[in-house]
Structure formats: C-alpha cells, structure tokens
Amino acid sequence: MSTAELACSYAALILADDGIEISADKIQTLISAANVQEVEPIWASIFARALEGKDIKELLTNVGSAGPASAAPAGAAGAAAPAEEKAEEKEEEKEESDEDMGFGLFD
C-alpha cells in the first residue's frame, strides 16, 4: 500500500472508532493534522465513497469469521484419509525412482 492509502485507511479507522461519520473532509482533516504531505485530496474522497453507509466496526469484527459451512458426512471424511495415504505413497515411490541409476548425461 502507498502512503496515501495507508493514511486514508488509518483516518477512516480513527473516525469509525470515535463513532464519527466518515466523509472526505474529515479524512482530509485527520491527514492534515497528522502532517502527512503526500496525500492527494482524491484519495480522501475515494475512501469516503467506498465506506459510505458501511459499518466499519462490523466489517472488522466479521473479517475472520466465515459463513456457515455444510458439514461433511462422517463416512466421507473417513474415506478421504486412505486416499491421501495412497497419494503420499505414490509420491515417495516417485522419489525413489529418481535415484541415480549409474547413467550419466555425458557418459
């Protein structure tokens, strides 16, 4: 991320944490107060439009949680384990067959 994106992101998080509505003017005010010089005003308006009407706190609390997933039947999970073991055995056999058999490329 660029400095401008980080500054706008942090400003939006500060506003959301204080319960203040996120707007381009408020983001720009926070960026100016932080003495960040490299941010063009367009970034503040882009972030304000992107976050308009969204609950930032809810977004942050739901980042790690996934939607409900359907549970796999117990029999299917048990059948998958032997298949994985067979795949591992095949991989090991391939490694053994790659050993040097005395034939060189330039012999």
Curated annotation (Swiss-Prot):
Function recorded in the entry: Plays an important role in the elongation step of protein synthesis.
* Complex and partners: P1 and P2 exist as dimers at the large ribosomal subunit.
Protein name, as recorded: Large ribosomal subunit protein P1
User: Which keywords, in A-to-Z order, does the entry hold?
Assistant: Allergen, Cytoplasm, Ribonucleoprotein, Ribosomal protein
> Bias category Acidic residues: which stretches?
90-101
* Annotated region (Disordered), positions in chain: 67-107
Molecular function as annotated in GO: protein kinase activator activity; ribonucleoprotein complex binding; structural constituent of ribosome
Q: Does the keyword Cytoplasm apply?
A: yes
Similarity comment text for this entry: Belongs to the eukaryotic ribosomal protein P1/P2 family.
